[in-house]
Each structure stands twice: as C-alpha cells, then as structure tokens.
C-alpha cells in the first residue's frame, strides 16, 4: 500500500500561482480533506511564510493554527530549509531552535528538512530540535543532475540522515528531472541500504513525474507527493486522483476514496477560477526545456512573477539560458530555495544589466564566501576573484558556527518598535525585518487578485482639462512621458540630468549607505535595494560628491527612478 502526501495548500499553489492562495480558500475544504486518509498534508513552510506577510497581509502563524483546528486526523507537514528556516539567509542556532519549537506548538507534526546544497551540517540544529519536541523528521535530499551528482552520493547522504535520527527520507526532485528508470535505481538502492520509509517528491514540469512515480513505487517507495487535480500538473505535482486510479486493484492500492477526492476537486475548480489570472501559461504546460535549464516548478512561476514585476517578461528566454551558466559558475548547486533564488536573481540581473555580474547580489557574495555551505563543485575562479578580497578564502566550517545568537537582540528591537503581541511576532521580525515591521503595524494591504479584463471595452480618460485658479482659467494638457521623473520639493529630477543615479530595477530601499556631502568612489555601495526577495547593493557609477539623496529608507522605487545626484 502506497501513501499519498497532499501538497495542494503549499507546494502545488506555490508552483502554479506563486503562493497567492488565501487562507479563506483553504479553511472551507480543510475538514473534508482531513477525511481522505492522506499520510500527511503539506500546508506550511517554503514560500508560504513570505507570501503571507508580503502579498496577502496574513499572519502565517494564524493560518497554521486555523488549519490545525480543522485538520485533526491528518498530520500537518511543513517544508523547512534547514538553517535557512523559511527565509533566504542562514539564521543562528537560537533562532532555528525557537522557530522549530514554535512551529510544532502551533500545529506542525512533520518537519521535512533539507539543505539547498545537501550540506547536512546545515540540517543538524533543525533535526535535533524537531526530534527533541517529539515531531517526526523527514530528511530531504535535493535531487539534481550535473557532472558531479551521482546515485552513490545520494545513497551516502541518506545514510548520514538516517544516522542523524531522521524518521524517513524524501527524494526532493524540485525540477522534475528524475527519470523513471533513474528513479527506480535510486529508490531500489536506498531500500537496500537504509531502513527508513522513502517518499518521492517531483514536479510535472518536464512531463516525467507521473511515469517516474509508477517506477519508484515499483522499486519500493512508500509515499509519493500529489496535489488535487485543479492544482496539479504543469510545474506542480501529479494529480492525486490519477495516481489513486493508476494503483487501484494492485498491491500498491492507496485505499483512498475517489468519490471523496472528486468532491474536493469540485471545490478547487472554483478556487482555480478565482485565481485564474495568476495561472501563467508558462507554468501550466509541459516544458521539456527544464531538462536543459533545470529550473524547478516554484522557481519558474516566481521567475515569471519577478520578470513581470520588472516589466521584462520579454527577457524570459534569455534568463532561462543564463541560469545554467550562473549555476555552473557557482559549482552546480541544486536549484531549490534559497539557491534557486540566488541563481535565478543573479541570472535576471545579468540579463537586465546587459553585463554578467555587473551587479552581484549580497547573497551571491555570501554563497561564494561559503556562508551557505560547501558547493558540490568548485566555484568559477574568475567569480572568486571578483568577490573575494586579496588573500581571502571561503570558510570551511559549519556556517552557523560563525553566527552569534540573535534572539535577545531581535526581541529587544521588535519590542522597541512596538510590534510584539506574541512571541511568534519576534520570529516573523527575525526572518523578515523590513517587511515584518510594516506588516505587524498593520500598514500593509493584501495585493488584489487580478481580474479578467473586460474585452472590447475601451476606457477613455480625458487628456485635456480646464483648471481655474483664483478666477483665472488655464488649459492643461496631459501627455504620457517616456522615462521616469521623481518630484521632490517642487522640482523635477530626470534621469538625463548631470550626476543622476537611477535604480536598475523595481524594489524597496532597505539601506542608504551615504549622506549628502559624502565623497564616494566609483564602485562604492550607496544604496541597498530589496527586489526579487533579495538585497542588492547599488554602486556609485562615478567618483564624486553626493549632492542630493532623493529617496528614504522604506521607499518603493521603479526602474529608472532617480535616487541620487552624484557629481
């Protein structure tokens, strides 16, 4: 008998609609899903935490509690990025411990824990803490293909995870690269050499996943990850209903009720209709190019979202071609959060700036320095030269060993900002300090769900007005203007002005590193922008003096906005 892990509330919607499903769409069907008999339901972790506060104006902790209240029989599962938790950097051990404890208290029964580089040192603290609180731990192995990845390596990794106390092993095939026969060999070897249950997680991006599931089940896989059909296929998982029928009447029969699954499917068809404008054609089709570019499902939908945000969706093909080049430069990391974000964002910047590594993200710098762990293969020497100072070498210890405790510090900061109502708020602030302050103060609004535009309806906006001021009438004509203007104190600053420094992309100002009157050299970091979930240092294009600073920390800027005048 094969068991099914349901991913509809987490990875499925993350892969297809960039994690925009609201809690209000989950709760009405949660109790019925609890009746199905899934091995577990993956409902939290991954990008859901970030999306809740950044886009949906929802408290992710409250979502978890609400789901736990309605799902009493099925274990709730989350995806935890090891030392990265649900963020995009390494957090110190005290934050990791506190997060795991609180996640368990709020309803998580099973922690699926992975490290993007398969560096088990980055999984140690999370595994130990989850075991300590009595949760089930599933150690996940990120599957990828490259000149340096082999079945033998994956088997050795699984043995290490078994020794560390994991209760089961997950083959996490985030890009849909696992072929049916390679999957068969991998699972067969694992069943021969370790004694833990095996779960296989894949995506349909390349079209291989349903076939691969049948072969890994034949090889002895105990569980497979599936999604209810309206949120299946494309960059998501295989459909639950199809897998249930495929195995019916065999020794692998799941025992799940197809009638009940179809009732759940009918509900999600309505949910799908609500979000239909978020379903990108790119993430819904089978795209065998993934076998070349190795872009995971969640990364693909986020890539589309990021390029739309930057007004550069026409660069999609170029970015797809750049991703494998950046991945090779970085030593072939598996493309899963946060490395998918690190590689993907750097590839986007390389294309948008029309020069490779003209802007290098802080995350790439930290990755190259070893702060994310040990890469599977050596990093491109040219990139090492650009990132490392003379005589500097990447670290070789467990990255978290270099991180001082943060809990007391972030607790004090959060309390001073007046944003703490419960202990979980401190963790939210620790993970996402910039966005959390606005969220916890109630300053954010949920982004609207895109609606289908009325076809054929033309909205006419007048372009000429008569304006009366103190009895005198003026004729005003409004025309679209190419380029970006930023008005400050009744004057207009344009990108054409001498010394104007413009934003290379759309984002939020997180740090201003200079003051008016400061002298800067070409290449000095003047501003840090957060865009595409990463922080990007913006360098001065010239040597000179900072005459004007036209932005404040927390401001949103668009591509081409003038942010400073440096002469």
Swiss-Prot record:
State what inhibits or activates this protein. Inhibited by magnesium, when its concentration exceeded the ATP one, and by high concentration of ATP and alpha-ketoglutarate.
Q: Which CDD domains match?
A: biotinyl_domain, DRE_TIM_PC_TC_5S
Q: How does activity depend on temperature?
A: Optimum temperature is 80-90 degrees Celsius.
Query: What sequence ranges are listed for the domain Biotinyl-binding?
Result: 492-567
Q: Where along the chain is substrate bound?
A: 10-14, 81, 337
UniProt key word Repressor: no
Residues carrying N6-carboxylysine? 172
Positions modified as N6-biotinyllysine? 533
Describe which pathway this protein belongs to, using the record's wording: Carbohydrate biosynthesis; gluconeogenesis
Q: What reaction gets catalysed by this protein?
A: hydrogencarbonate + pyruvate + ATP = oxaloacetate + ADP + phosphate + H(+)
Record's SUPFAM superfamilies?
Answer: Aldolase (SSF51569), post-HMGL domain-like (SSF89000), Single hybrid motif (SSF51230)
Influence of pH: Optimum pH is 8.5.
| EC number of the protein | 6.4.1.1
The UniProt annotation places a divalent metal cation binding at 11, 172, 201, 203
Q: Which UniProt keywords apply?
A: ATP-binding, Biotin, Gluconeogenesis, Ligase, Magnesium, Metal-binding, Multifunctional enzyme, Nucleotide-binding, Pyruvate
Quaternary state and partners of this protein?
Heterooctamer of four A and four B subunits.
Listed NCBIfam families: oadA, PRK09282.1, PRK12331.1, PRK14041.1
Protein name as catalogued: Pyruvate carboxylase subunit B
């Amino acid at each position: 008998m094969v068991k099914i892990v349901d991913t509809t509330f987490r990875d499925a919607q993350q892969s297809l609609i960039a994690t925009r499903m609201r809690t209000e769409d989950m709760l009405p069907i949660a109790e019925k899903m609890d009746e199905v008999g899934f091995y577990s339901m993956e409902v939290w972790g991954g990008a859901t935490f970030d999306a809740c506060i950044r886009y949906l104006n929802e408290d992710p902790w409250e979502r978890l509690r609400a789901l736990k209240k309605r799902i009493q029989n099925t274990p709730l599962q989350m995806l935890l990025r090891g030392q990265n938790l649900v963020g995009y950097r390494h957090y110190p051990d005290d934050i990791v411990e506190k997060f795991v404890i609180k996640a368990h208290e709020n309803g998580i029964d099973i922690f699926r824990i992975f490290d993007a580089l398969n560096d088990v040192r980055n999984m140690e603290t999370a595994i130990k803490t989850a075991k300590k609180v009595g949760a089930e731990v599933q150690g996940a192995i990120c599957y990828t293909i490259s000149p340096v990845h082999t079945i033998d390596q994956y088997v050795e990794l699984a043995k290490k995870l078994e020794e560390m106390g994991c209760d089961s092993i997950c083959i996490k095939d985030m890009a849909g690269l696992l072929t049916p026969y390679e999957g068969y060999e991998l699972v067969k070897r694992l069943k021969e050499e370790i004694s833990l249950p095996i779960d296989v997680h894949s995506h349909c991006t390349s079209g291989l996943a349903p076939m691969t599931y049948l072969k890994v089940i034949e090889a002895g896989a105990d569980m497979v990850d599936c999604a209810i059909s309206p949120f299946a296929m494309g960059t998501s998982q295989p459909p639950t209903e199809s897998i249930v029928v495929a195995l019916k009447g065999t020794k692998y029969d799941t025992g799940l009720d197809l009638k009940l699954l179809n009732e759940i499917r009918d509900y999600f068809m309505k949910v799908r209709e609500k979000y239909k404008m978020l379903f990108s054609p790119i993430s819904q089709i089978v795209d065998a190019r993934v076998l070349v570019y190795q872009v995971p499902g969640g990364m693909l939908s986020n890539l589309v979202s990021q390029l739309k945000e930057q007004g550069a969706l026409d660069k999609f093909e170029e970015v797809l071609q750049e991703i494998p080049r950046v991945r090779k430069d970085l030593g072939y990391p598996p493309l899963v959060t946060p490395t998918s974000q690190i590689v993907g964002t750097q590839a986007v910047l390389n294309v948008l700036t029309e020069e490779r590594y003209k802007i290098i993200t802080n995350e790439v710098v930290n990755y190259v320095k070893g702060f994310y762990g040990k890469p599977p293969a050596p990093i491109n020497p040219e990139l090492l030269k650009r990132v490392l100072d003379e005589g500097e070498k990447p670290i070789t210890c467990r990255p978290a060993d270099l991180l001082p405790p943060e809990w007391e510090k972030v607790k004090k900061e959060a309390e001073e900002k007046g944003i703490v109502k419960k202990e979980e708020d401190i963790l939210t602030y620790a993970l996402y300090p910039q966005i959390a302050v606005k969220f916890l103060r109630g300053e954010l609004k949920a982004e609207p769900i895109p609606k289908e535009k009325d076809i054929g309806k033309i909205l006419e906006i007048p372009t000429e007005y008569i304006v009366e001021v103190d009895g005198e009438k003026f004729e005003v004509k409004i025309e679209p203007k190419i380029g970006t203007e930023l008005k400050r104190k009744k004057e207009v600053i344009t990108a054409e002005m001498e010394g104007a420094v413009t934003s290379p992309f759309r984002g939020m100002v997180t740090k201003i590193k200079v003051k008016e009157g400061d002298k800067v050299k070409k290449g000095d970091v003047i501003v840090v922008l957060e865009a595409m979930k990463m922080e990007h240092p913006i360098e001065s294009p010239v040597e000179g003096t900072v005459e004007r600073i036209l932005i404040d920390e927390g401001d949103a800027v668009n591509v081409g906005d003038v942010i400073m005048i440096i002469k």
